[in-house]
Amino acid sequence: MRKIALFIAMLLIPCMSFAGLLSSNSSTTPISKEYKQQLMGSPVYIQIFKEERTLDLFVKMGETYQLLDSYKICNYSGGLGPKQRQGDFKSPEGFYNVQRSQLKPDSRFYKAINIGFPNAYDRAHGYEGKYLMIHGACVSIGCYAMTDAGIDEIFQFVTGALVFGQPNVQVSIYPFRMTDANMARHKYSYYADFWKQLKPGYDYFEQTHKPPVVSIVDGRYVVNKPLSHEVVHPQLASNYTVPETK
């Protein structure tokens, strides 16, 4: 109740009109610091880019998602490519969902958000691992480590969104910004076929500023396709009932 009251108090701070925020911002320009608190509790969306060492946090404004801020990733491990097994020291790539049970405010790495690895895609391929997180302390063994100041703000907005009714926060993790030029640069990579499954999700958000709807069909990621009874959506396939975090 105290947490909910805090978010409500933040949202009631006198401020400029919401329409003004919409007209003065774009999906690629971070929102001014003085306006951030006005958006506390709004739905959010996360994109991570390994090669650029960047976490982008977006907030819903009207019908689309705008860039709240970009945060430098202190550290991740294992280079490009998806995590496949416990102990390979790699950080995951793919599409994940975070629910309230995956938040750890008292982590030994300051604060932590369990991304939900392995998801339905990972399990379909026999990938395994646990405790894969976005956390503070700038130390990583398969996780995405942020500065404490960075994870503080990310954690605050993710918590606020979930407290105010967002069922889960989507986290899209890419090896790099999936432009055509970057895809061509990596076309001979061992992981090229896997990355081609991720690119439609990246492209969809670039074009619409809305998170992609991601499903798994025959062990492959499929973006924005009509669902049938055979399709497993990652958020429905989560086997987390308690927070699996450090």
Q: What kind of feature is each model-predicted range?
A:
Residues 6-11:
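Sec-dependent N-terminal signal peptides
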Residues 61-76:
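Short Gly/aromatic-enriched secondary-structure transition segments
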Residues 28-45, 57-58, 75-87, 91-100, ...:
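N-terminal post-signal-peptidase region of extra-cytosolic proteins
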Residues 87-244:
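Exported/periplasmic cell-wall-interacting domains
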Residues 1-4:
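Positively charged n-region of N-terminal signal peptides that target proteins for export
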